Amino acid sequence: MRKNSTSNPSPSHQFLTPPKNTTTVVNNNNNTFVNKNKIINENSNQKMFSVGSLVNQIDKNQQQQQQQQQQTHQVLPQRKFSGVSTMISKYNEQQPSSSSSTASSSSSPSLPPKPLLSTINNINNSGSANNNTPSNLSPNTLSPTSIIKKNNNNNISGSPSPSPSPAPTPTILSPLPSPRRQLPTRPPSPLPKLPSRPTSPVPPNPDEALNTTTTNNNNNNNNNNNNNNNNNNNNNNNNNNNNNSDNNYISKLGSHSVKTLPIPPPNDKPAPPPRPWSSSGTLTTPPTIATTKTSTNINSTNVKYQTLSPSSTTATTATTTTTINNNVTTPPTTPPSQTIAFNNNNNNNNNNNNNNNNNNNSNNNKPLPPTSTKPPRPKIAPRNDISPIPVTSLSTANITNTPTVVIEQTPIIAPIQDSQNIAASDLRTLRQRTFTRKQASMKLNGEDFSSLSLSTTPTSVSPSTPSSANPTPSTTPPSMSPSNSVSNEFLTINSNENINNDLINSFNSDDSNNSNNSNSSLSLASASSSASTTTTSTNSLNDTSFNNISININPNNGLSVSNFISSHKKKTSFISGTLRRDTLDIKTILIEKINVQYTITTQLSQKPSRKSLLPPINSSTSFNKVIKEIIETEADYIDQMEVIINLYYFAALEMSKYKLMTANDIYQIFSNIEELYYVSLRLYPMLLNIIPVLDHENQYPNIEEIFLYNSKAFQRYGSYLSTHDHSIKVLNSLIDGNNVVNQIFQYVKSLPHSKQLNLQSFLIKPCQRLCKYPLLLRELKKALPPEDDSLEAEEHHKIFQRSLILMEKIVNDINGKMANDNKIQSTVKEIGTKDIEQQLRDQTFLKSSNRIKKLKKKGNKVIVTLYLLSQILIIFEKGTFKKKVKIIPLKNILEIIDIERELQFGISINYLNDNDIQNNNNNNQNNLSSTNDTTSSTPPTTTTTTNSTPTTTTTTTNSTPTVNVNTLSIKLSCDNYQDKLIWLNDIDEAINILKILTGSYKFNVSEKDINININNNNNNNNNNNNNNNNNNNNNNNNNNNNNNNINENNINENNINSNNTSLENSGECINNNINNNNNTSN
């Protein structure tokens, strides 16, 4: 026996699991069979494990594993066999039961049966496929990954080779893995025959059913001679001819989802990500889609296409005719469908390999499916190079007659030498790109879609020419010059009959969702042979080319240019994220709108300025010079106000539409500047009327009367001047915080009429103008001749003086109002509560003091601030952590008392709450109603006695009961006695002024005046003349009161009766009679 030597297996053999009790056949140099369990390679002196020892080791491991399972009561999952191990297990199952005995390590060797060898063995390198002798068999039949090295010597350790013995009974192989070794992934097994491709389920809606086409592609392999019906690939590399498969994607036109999607065949290697450009410089485009358009009534249509040869520099055309028949029998629920597509062909020769790429079917009006990526941009061809045009057709529905679609293509400008097809998806959004850009952001050769205007004739629509006054004319790029530019593409659609509106709308809606990256032109025409047509031509400037758009629309169909353009606006869809969109430049839009406004204003006022339009003014005297200065400065002032309103104010309103400014910001900046503009427009014609008077000597126009007449209008400057400082602060904050606002105002500043003045300089003009009016009037008064004895000159000077005083008063009042507003704002800022600003609105600030002390209930004093305004009294106490504000309306104050004895320099303010005032008013109303009832039931009694003694009259009235109201009081202490007296006087005067202004002030009448005994003594002896002499008797009233006992017999009974009736009246009637008597006596 030879000495067995073993060696550890290499790491690549760690996953080997040789079966139990197997014999190994070793092919020696002498072609003899040796039955051995261990083999030694003497040349390499490398020790190898024999099969028997490995099997024994596996048995031991299996027993240990079973013992562990029994102890833990766990069942380990068995390995699923695949590949060669599966074949071995199948072979063991086919053997008879007699072969299941286990062979020992000393059993004679035997070869595996021939069926096993023919199933799993590979043919030896000798090349004899029919020789099945043991010398030609590989030693790794049962374990294809194991390596058992040959013995090059005939004898091992000098021992003779034993003779071959008959083969024992074959044993059952057990390919269990070793639990101690981590098995790597198994090498891939041969791929089985692939089944046919599945398709997506049929849509539930039968109306959306599509015509599907099945393509059987043949794959011819020269080595295996296998025919596959999945791919039509002819591999030229290694004697294989490869053909790219023709994928027919069928979807519905106008829908955003694909109904049938083929599944790509599996590849051994993952497909690389799509690249927009290949290494050879050709465009790699994904397969496009052949879409179908369902319709109910479709007649046979002939679609003609004209294409250009890619190799020729001149426009050579080839005509392809596609005929679509509608004689297709379809179920009642499924309408017939049309398949209309682009066909793009690319022919490239690389290393004698003919590859047909991009044999795709798609529709011009259908977007890509959601599973595909964005189609790449077309490769740009060199100048004067002609690119092939994809065959296109437009899906039509409800077409009564046969439309003809003709496509003519001219060369496209591009800087690459290789001619390249333009993808259908790149051409289809030209209409969308042309019509969906915002009007303000489009620069159509200096024009805009908003400039489209209908002419007087009904057969044409022409765009209006751009204004020559536009300061920013558009220029044509150098590449667009006639010498460098190439003619554009034209797509013309001609129809002999009327087209339904639904067709046009569906066509427009489909086009609006497509993206177009090619620089081509589109011409759409749909005309009627029996009716007049309307033609619209617009020259538009895109990024790199002009688009000539010609639209022939039948007016009988109710279509219009505005409807056609509005229907091509961008619509949101699932593919909208992949569309190429133009960004909206707000700055450009605003500048264009300002240019339009500037053009309008300059056209309305053809003359540059009002000052240049003034007639010549006589300035021979100093008085005329001052008047000339007033008129000229007023003309310039109006022009400046127009710049503010027409340009700056207009720009601010436009920026508010884009939320760059708010309406509150605009009001705070410009205030009531429009009112001031209209005041000046009213004053300016009056000033112009006095110019002819200046030509006459010794005549002075009554200019002062103009200012007197407009004195109330000048008071509108008050609110503007009071908020001017705040408006400048708001404007500066907006300019500093927003760059767009700053740029827009800077652009307005650069316009000619602005004269390089910013908005801050214009906003101060009204303030300067109002303050200049009194100065000019003062100069006019100085220029007047000295007063003479004439009444006219004296009256003239008086009017001038009056107008001057009035204008100065207006300015002072405005300045005082500004100062008052500043004080109010400082008060609001100091108090700092929420409602204080609203309560201080429309208040006049009178005085304040922060040295007043308030007496609390405990006896201590707190320093407070006392504010006296026109209608309220504020007591503000600023605590450490909290502010206390007490607001007392002046109308609620009952009295102010000097409490010097109780509190040094102290005053007490007694007032009512609002609730108490309401209750008091309600009680007064009830009392008045009760007194009215009593007076009606029991009238006052009057007793009149007429004797020789003086007459006495007694009147008794029911007085109203007084109402007891709980009053509140606040005790304050001033700094000194003088301040106390001043505060007492000021508060009392403010209360009385408020009562007078509101009409609640009552004059007290004493009881002596009410109970006066009126005795009229008349010296007239005629009783018939007493009624005519009442005035004379009243005139002598004061004298007759001292002589009551004289002429008693001459008392007129009528006078007594009149006096008695007057006594029955109320106190107001008595007072009126007394006043009448006094008036007559005077």
Curated annotation (Swiss-Prot):
Q: Which Pfam families match?
A: RhoGEF
Start and end residues of each stretch annotated as PH-like: 838-994
Could you tell me what this protein does? GTPase-activating protein.
Q: Cellular component per GO?
A: cytosol
Name of the molecule in the record = RhoGEF domain-containing protein gxcI
Q: Which residues form the DH domain?
A: 622-817
Q: Where is the composition biased (Pro residues)?
A: 185-206, 262-276, 367-379
Biased composition regions of type Low complexity, renumbered to the chain: 20-29, 62-71, 96-109, 116-160, 170-184, 211-244, 282-366, 450-473
Write out the biased-composition intervals (Polar residues): 1-15
The source organism is Dictyostelium discoideum (Social amoeba)
Which top-rank group of organisms is this from? Eukaryota
Region of interest (Disordered), ranges: 1-29, 59-78, 91-394, 438-488, 504-524, 920-961, 1017-1060
**This protein's domain notes:** The PH-like region is similar to the PH domain but contains an insert. It is unclear whether it is a real PH domain.
Q: Which GO terms describe its molecular function?
A: guanyl-nucleotide exchange factor activity
What keywords are annotated for this sequence in UniProt? Guanine-nucleotide releasing factor
Question: Which SUPFAM superfamilies does the record cross-reference, listed alphabetically?
Answer: DBL homology domain (DH-domain) (SSF48065)
Xref: CDD domains: RhoGEF
